[in-house]
Amino acid sequence: MNALSPVTAPKARSFRLEPRQPAASHEEERLHRKQRLAATFRLFGRYGFDQGLAGHVTARDPEFPEQYWINPLGVHFSQIRTSDLQLVDHDGNILIGNRPINNAGFTIHSALHKARPDEIAAAHTQFT
């Protein structure tokens, strides 16, 4: 039985996403993306999409599109906060933050962000 079987999966609830007004500045949009990214990690952690160190989710920086925010290595998804996120460039340099990142995650996401400059975020995770 997997984590999403009808026996163990949480009951689905529907919700409606309201349109969002464009951000007034790069800083406002950056905060919005980082908050949503941290919330995504916590949701993934809550529902079991957090096996080991294999998962990573990234969001492109709005001001510097060749850079993106990624989770630090060794922090459980359910514990990630906005302040934990690391800003990296396509070469793997950590520009903001002082924690290591998952090298496999960097390799996957840097290729995705280079190949798809129109995409804002990407996720890769594993579960049992």
At which residue positions do the language-model features occur?
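Extreme N-terminal flexible tails
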Residues: 1-24, 33
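An anion-binding catalytic pocket shared by soluble metabolic enzymes
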Residues: 27, 34-121
